[in-house]
């Protein structure tokens, strides 16, 4: 049985043109929790999707400054994880968990 904390680590899959291109290299892109570490991300992906992870790369996208009705606000920072899977394994992100 999967640990409920794994669902807190993986926020959502990233479906963009660039993330679709890296899927050809056995990589999948996820938005993850800001405080999630690489070992936590690896454990969560392996537990939730039943695949073998070989590498995890992370990047933090800084939030943009936006204006709304004259007030200045700031979007939240987003942490993104590029997960490399073992040869011959894949994840279908279009289906839910």
UniProtKB/Swiss-Prot annotation:
Keywords of this entry: Ribonucleoprotein, Ribosomal protein, RNA-binding, rRNA-binding
GO molecular function list: rRNA binding; structural constituent of ribosome
This protein's record includes keyword rRNA-binding: yes
Record GO biological process: translation
Gene Ontology cellular component annotations, sorted alphabetically: ribonucleoprotein complex; ribosome
InterPro entries: Nucleotide-bd_a/b_plait_sf (IPR012677), Ribosomal_uL23-like (IPR013025), Ribosomal_uL23/eL15/eS24_sf (IPR012678)
Function recorded in the entry: One of the early assembly proteins it binds 23S rRNA. One of the proteins that surrounds the polypeptide exit tunnel on the outside of the ribosome. Forms the main docking site for trigger factor binding to the ribosome.
Protein family membership: Belongs to the universal ribosomal protein uL23 family.
Subunit structure: Part of the 50S ribosomal subunit. Contacts protein L29, and trigger factor when it is bound to the ribosome.
Record-given protein name: Large ribosomal subunit protein uL23
Organism this protein belongs to: Brucella canis (strain ATCC 23365 / NCTC 10854 / RM-666)
């Amino acid at each position: 049985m999967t640990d409920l904390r794994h669902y807190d680590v993986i926020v959502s899959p990233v479906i963009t043109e660039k993330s679709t291109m890296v899927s050809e290299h056995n990589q999948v892109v996820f938005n993850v929790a800001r405080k999630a570490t690489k070992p936590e991300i690896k454990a969560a992906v392996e537990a939730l999707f039943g695949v073998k992870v070989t590498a995890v790369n992370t990047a933090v996208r800084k939030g943009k400054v936006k204006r709304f009705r004259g007030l200045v606000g700031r979007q939240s920072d987003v942490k993104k994880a590029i997960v490399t899977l073992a040869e011959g394994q894949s994840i279908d992100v279009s289906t839910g968990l």
